[in-house]
Swiss-Prot record:
Residues 1-18 have a biased composition (Polar residues). Keywords: Autophagy, Coiled coil, Cytoplasm, Endosome, Lipid-binding, Membrane, Protein transport, Transport. Residues 1-22 are annotated as: Disordered. This is Sorting nexin-4. It comes from Candida glabrata (strain ATCC 2001 / BCRC 20586 / JCM 3761 / NBRC 0622 / NRRL Y-65 / CBS 138).
């Protein structure tokens, strides 16, 4: 376990704005947990492996378990370095261990960047760094996920490599079973859907559509700002050439041009900083929120799968009971032609009927037990999903507030800087 000073943990990264300190339940007590992802670095791979990007993950917590059960201060910082695949494994383990929880999504693998060779570029790594920050912040805010032992192992670091090697194979088998279940029920629908879930789906669809529209608008804003920045850069170069031409003939005009060029340059730099914030952070927040909504829908689909399992068992049980009753009353067990053929072949129809009734009674008994279990599972998933949706709403509202505040702060900072710059230019030109 690496340690760092308290001051070092909060410097040098814009991602610090996305970090959070939440109280998490551990053994009946509540502990603070703050996670910061920063400093993406290209590193050389081991023998035979290519280079990769690692991310510094700094954790502050007063949970003694994170500090070897010694008395810990919240200012004591644990620092580890993890690559993207490590975070993917953490995500998959949480998903496997907590099937009823809404597991925050991860950034996409970005295959195109791998093919183009841009996965070590600043824009790609910084955007991914911010997205990983969003993921770990959501985990730290979740009352169940934040107390997971695997999260502690991931953040502390001493046992992570061993744990990763031991768990990978087992996890893949469990995920294959989940995929099979999902495919089997992909085109089935719940017959008796709770109206509350219908309302939740409608709200989430509307929110997702709104987020995607805002995302498209700000993508256009980024493109437009890039064009403006380029135009002002060209304007600055042209004015510099003009300044050189008049510097020998008119010192006053040359000085005025110099001041104006500085204003143009400051505007270009300021807009570039604002644009980088929108591109590297705000757009990532919007995209991650859309993916988070998708994770919530996935949890609701899993809840639906359990409900579908219960409804299908119920239908099967009803059919079995009906068939048994028909046999008892003498109307079941096959059609008229089949009965005549059995009679001609010398079958004892009464013995066959009793045998079918006995088998159906055994089936009904087994189905009744399975139906009770399926009902409990479906009800549990429904209750837990409602709790998860409530927590999702809390985290989502908190994120929107933080993200919009950051966007407002960056815009205010830009315009205050421009006001100060051009007031100086105006005074100098008078």
């Amino acid at each position: 376990m690496d340690s760092a000073s308290a001051d070092a943990s909060v410097t040098g990264s814009g991602n610090a704005k996305g970090s959070s300190a939440e109280r998490v339940n551990g053994g009946g007590k509540f502990y603070k947990l703050e996670i910061l992802v920063s400093d993406p670095q290209k590193r050389a791979g081991e023998a035979g492996l290519g280079p990769y990007v690692s991310y510094q993950i700094s954790t502050r917590t007063d949970n003694p378990s994170y500090h070897g059960n010694q008395k810990a201060s919240f200012d004591d910082i644990i620092v580890v370095h993890r690559r993207y695949n490590d975070v993917v494994l953490l995500h998959d383990i949480l998903q496997n261990d907590h099937p009823t929880c809404i597991i925050p999504p991860l950034p996409d693998k970005k295959v195109l960047q791998y093919i183009a060779g841009d996965r070590f570029g600043r824009r790609f790594t910084q955007r991914r760094c911010h997205s990983l920050q969003n993921f770990l912040r959501r985990v730290s805010q979740h009352p169940i996920l934040s107390t997971s032992k695997v999260l502690e192992i991931f953040l502390v670091g001493n046992e992570w490599d061993t744990y990763r090697k031991n768990i990978a194979g087992t996890l893949q088998n469990a995920q294959k079973e989940d995929v099979t279940d999902a495919v089997m029920n992909a085109f089935k629908k719940v017959h008796n859907q709770n109206e509350e879930f219908t309302e939740i789906r409608d709200r989430s669809d509307k929110l997702d559509n709104s987020v995607n529209r805002i995302n498209k608008v700000f993508h256009r804003v980024v493109k437009k700002n890039e064009a403006i920045i380029e135009d002002y850069s060209k304007l600055g170069l042209t004015l510099q050439e003009l300044q050189e031409l008049v510097s020998s003939d008119n010192d006053k005009l040359a000085d005025s041009l110099k001041v104006f060029i500085e204003g143009v340059t400051q505007f270009s730099y300021g807009l570039q900083d604002l644009n980088m914030f929108i591109d590297y952070e705000y757009l990532i927040d919007l995209k991650d929120l859309s993916h988070y909504i998708g994770s919530m829908k996935q949890t609701m689909r899993l809840k639906d799968q359990k409900q579908i399992d219960y409804e299908e068992l119920s239908d099967y049980l009803t059919k079995s009971i009906k068939e048994k009753n028909n046999l008892i009353s003498g109307y079941g067990g096959g059609n008229f032609l089949t009965s005549k053929l059995e009679e001609l072949a010398g079958y004892n129809q009464e013995a066959s009927r009793r045998d079918k009734i006995n088998k159906l009674e055994s089936t009904i008994s087994s189905l009744t037990t399975e139906l009770e279990t399926a009902k409990k599972v479906a009800d549990t998933f429904e209750q837990e999903t409602l709790k998860e949706v409530k927590k999702f709403e809390e985290i989502k509202n908190d994120e929107l507030k933080i993200s919009l505040n950051n966007l407002a702060d960056e815009n205010i900072k830009f315009y205050e800087r421009m006001l100060e710059t051009w007031e100086k230019v105006d005074q100098s030109l008078r």
